[in-house]
From Swiss-Prot:
The lineage of its organism: Bacteria, Pseudomonadati, Pseudomonadota, Alphaproteobacteria, Caulobacterales. Its main location: cytoplasm. The gene is dapF. GO terms for cellular component: cytosol. It is an enzyme of class 5 (isomerase). Belongs to the diaminopimelate epimerase family. Homodimer. Keywords: Amino-acid biosynthesis, Cytoplasm, Isomerase, Lysine biosynthesis. Pfam families: DAP_epimerase. The active site is at C77, C222. This is Diaminopimelate epimerase. GO terms for biological process: lysine biosynthetic process via diaminopimelate.
Length: 277
C-alpha cells in the first residue's frame, strides 16, 4: 500500500459509525478501491465503515472525500462530516467549519461538549435526484422491493447527497434488515444502489431507525439515513419537522427547518491514532 504507507490517521466514530480519517496537506492521497478495502477490513486492516480524506480547499476549511468499506467513493456521510467538523473546529479554535463535499457545501457548528450540528442542506426529493431508474412518487413508492409482510407498505425515497429508501415498519428490532437490506441495496430501480432504512415511528417526535448502509452493511448509526428517515416520515405526516432518531449506537437530533435545510446534531469521538500500514 505504497500510496498510503506511513501516513498518520485518526480513528473516529459518531455513535459507533466508525471512520479512518487522514489529512492530505502533506502528501496527496488517492487510494485504490483495493487499498480502501484493505484499510476497512476489520480482520486484517484497521477496520472502519468509511475511509475519509480531509483535503485543503479554496474558500472552505476543507474538502472532504468519503469511501465506503467496499472501496467505492461516495458523495456524503453525515456522521463522518460531523466528526471532521469537530476536528476542524478543534484545530481552528472557531465554532464553525465550512466543508466542501462531492454532494455540496456543508456547515458544521459547535452544539456543546463534543456535540456538533451539521447543516446537511435541503433534501432532494425528485425521482431523478434520488436517482431512480424511472419516474415514481418518492413520497410513497408504488413498487414492491422485497416480499416481507412488514415491507409491503410503500416506502419513501430521499437523497441527502446519497440515495435512501425508508420503510416504515411496526417494530424496527424485528425488521428483516440483514436479509432485505442487501437485496434492496442492489435493486435495479436504484442505478447507484441505495441505503435502506427501517423506521419505527414511536411518537410524533421520536423514530427508532436501523440502516443497511450501501457498501458497508448494517451500521450502528447512519447520519444521512437519520436525516432521510426524518424527512420521509414528515412528508407522510407521521411526525412534525423535528425528531430524536434512535439508532443502534445512540441518538441523533434531526430538524427539517422551514427554509428547507436539514440540521443533524450528535456526538463526535476520537478513538485512537496511528499510521496506515
Amino acid at each position: 500500500m505504497s500510496a498510503a504507507m506511513g501516513r498518520p490517521f485518526l480513528k473516529m466514530n459518531g455513535l459507533g459509525n466508525d471512520f479512518v480519517v487522514v489529512e492530505t496537506r502533506s502528501a496527496p492521497f488517492e487510494p485504490t478501491a483495493a487499498q480502501v478495502r484493505a484499510i476497512a477490513d476489520r480482520a486484517t486492516g484497521i477496520g472502519c465503515d468509511q475511509l475519509i480524506a480531509v483535503d485543503p480547499a479554496e474558500g472552505a476549511d476543507a474538502h472532504v472525500r468519503f469511501w465506503n468499506a467496499d472501496g467505492e467513493e461516495v458523495g456524503a456521510c453525515g456522521n463522518g462530516t460531523r466528526c471532521v467538523g469537530w476536528l476542524l473546529m478543534q484545530s481552528s479554535g472557531k465554532d464553525e467549519a465550512v466543508i466542501e463535499t462531492r454532494a455540496g457545501r456543508l456547515v458544521a457548528t459547535r452544539a456543546g461538549e463534543r456535540l456538533v450540528s451539521v447543516d446537511m442542506g435541503p433534501p432532494r426529493l425528485e425521482w431523478n435526484e434520488i436517482p431512480l431508474a424511472e419516474p415514481h412518487d418518492t413520497r410513497a413508492l408504488d413498487v414492491v422491493l422485497y416480499h416481507h409482510a412488514d415491507l409491503m407498505a410503500p416506502p419513501g425515497c430521499v437523497s441527502m447527497g446519497n440515495p435512501h429508501v425508508v420503510f416504515f415498519v411496526p417494530d424496527a428490532e424485528q425488521a428483516p434488515a440483514a436479509e432485505a437490506g442487501p437485496a434492496i441495496e442492489g435493486h435495479p430501480l436504484f442505478p447507484e444502489h441505495v441505503n435502506v432504512g427501517f423506521a419505527q415511528v414511536k411518537a410524533p417526535d421520536r423514530i427508532r431507525l436501523r440502516v443497511w448502509e450501501r457498501g458497508a452493511g448494517l451500521t450502528k448509526a447512519c447520519g444521512t439515513g437519520a436525516c432521510a428517515a426524518m424527512v420521509a416520515a414528515s412528508r407522510r405526516g407521521l411526525i412534525g419537522r423535528h425528531a430524536t432518531m434512535e439508532l443502534d449506537g445512540g441518538e441523533l437530533f434531526v430538524e427539517w427547518r422551514a427554509d428547507g435545510h436539514v440540521i443533524m446534531t450528535g456526538p463526535a469521538a476520537v478513538d485512537f491514532q496511528g499510521e496506515l500500514p
